[in-house]
Amino acid sequence: MSLRQRLAQLVGRLQDPQKVARFQRLCGVEAPPRRSADRREDEKAEAPLAGDPRLRGRQPGAPGGPQPPGSDRNQCPAKPDGGGAPNGVRNGLAAELGPASPRRAGALRRNSLTGEEGQLARVSNWPLYCLFCFGTELGNELFYILFFPFWIWNLDPLVGRRLVVIWVLVMYLGQCTKDIIRWPRPASPPVVKLEVFYNSEYSMPSTHAMSGTAIPISMVLLTYGRWQYPLIYGLILIPCWCSLVCLSRIYMGMHSILDIIAGFLYTILILAVFYPFVDLIDNFNQTHKYAPFIIIGLHLALGIFSFTLDTWSTSRGDTAEILGSGAGIACGSHVTYNMGLVLDPSLDTLPLAGPPITVTLFGKAILRILIGMVFVLIIRDVMKKITIPLACKIFNIPCDDIRKARQHMEVELPYRYITYGMVGFSITFFVPYIFFFIGIS
């Protein structure tokens, strides 16, 4: 057998959805009973989507064949009295299947753009379920919108900015690679889909795995030598964070083993090539006279390019959101630097020592997070309400159905880019200015 054939066999084994289902069963996740009748109903509901390239290769009723993202969802497990029950359990809420049965769990989040809801599942190991729910949230918007501001407002603005640069680069390349390779999510059945929020995206590579690899490695690279702490702490953090995020994606039924390995190795390659330029990029963003114009134009061009790679999916909006956030944070840091609101410590003060934890320090940190997040969320909601109707009006797109309107590039790109650009700008300029004004900077 040639090397190419062996590699093809290895790829096939690592991509096998049965391995994902086996891992789920090992962790106490099983599909509820009475799947066959409900599967036929789902196939009828999904028939109009047969033209989507993410749905090609599916044979209706074939339980083990290649199937697209989103198949076999909205299952109706049996009630204790034998009657069917609609899928009404969401966001990790649990109900009882019966007196002696394991509890059931629904999808973490409903996909607001596609209307998808994850199928219910029998979960017998709830500590693992909670752990992997936490792990998968380490790659979602809620985590990012808390994590990056916390670094910038409370810990180290320089590290926070450079983490964002790396995150934008890694996530952009990962999202574009997905739309070029176009591999579907693991087939369901046999896999149980516990999460469907990203189910309309392609699978290879896992951008959760990429983010879960890039962030902890970059944190250690950026902070070790700048801050005083034992290196062993960082060497413990990296595998714990990375493995938790990666395994959570298999547990949720969203990725094959191959997707995870590819995402991890792809991130290592990106960091090896681009990490030496992070310092140069950050300095350019802060100090160059025309940096804001170049930042906005470059990120917008990258967003337009990514929108041409494939038909509509939620990944296009996510890409625009990532690019908008990165552009806003970079532009905000430029303005903040030139106004002298936030100054990085001089090199002769390094390595920095952590300040003693006092009630005053802790109180200021909490106050900064509360005030800052309230302001950021207000900005996000206001920009949402402005940009979608405005884009619809400019491009003559009906906005009666917001979900359909957002599937047009002319609406989704400016909405996400402008909204999250303002969010990023608020994080690095408006909010620090408020802190300076009220005396908690």
UniProtKB/Swiss-Prot annotation:
Q: In which tissues is it expressed?
A: Ubiquitous, with the strongest level in placenta and kidney.
Q: Which residues carry this modification: Phosphoserine?
A: 101, 112
InterPro entries to which the protein is assigned, alphabetical: P_Acid_Pase_2/haloperoxi_sf, P_Acid_Pase_2/haloperoxidase
Organism of origin: Homo sapiens
Query: What family does this chain come from, according to its entry?
Result: Belongs to the type 2 lipid phosphate phosphatase family.
Q: Where is the active site?
A: 208, 255
Task: Give the E.C. number(s).
Answer: 3.1.3.-
Q: Region entry Phosphatase sequence motif II: which residue ranges?
A: 205-208
GO BP term, example = regulation of keratinocyte differentiation
Q: Where in the cell is it found?
A: Endoplasmic reticulum membrane; Cell membrane
Q: Which SUPFAM superfamilies does UniProt cross-reference here?
A: Acid phosphatase/Vanadium-dependent haloperoxidase (SSF48317)
Lineage of the species this protein comes from:
Eukaryota, Metazoa, Chordata, Craniata, Vertebrata
Q: Which GO terms describe its molecular function?
A: dihydrosphingosine-1-phosphate phosphatase activity; sphingosine-1-phosphate phosphatase activity
Q: Which UniProt keywords apply?
A: Cell membrane, Endoplasmic reticulum, Hydrolase, Lipid metabolism, Membrane, Phosphoprotein, Transmembrane, Transmembrane helix
* Stated name of the protein: Sphingosine-1-phosphate phosphatase 1
Residue ranges, annotated region (Phosphatase sequence motif III): 248-259
Spell out the residue ranges making up region: Phosphatase sequence motif I.
178-186
- Sequence segments annotated as region (Disordered): 25-110
Q: Which residues carry this modification: Phosphothreonine?
A: 114
- Give the site residues for Stabilizes the active site histidine for nucleophilic attack: 259
A Pfam family of this chain: PAP2
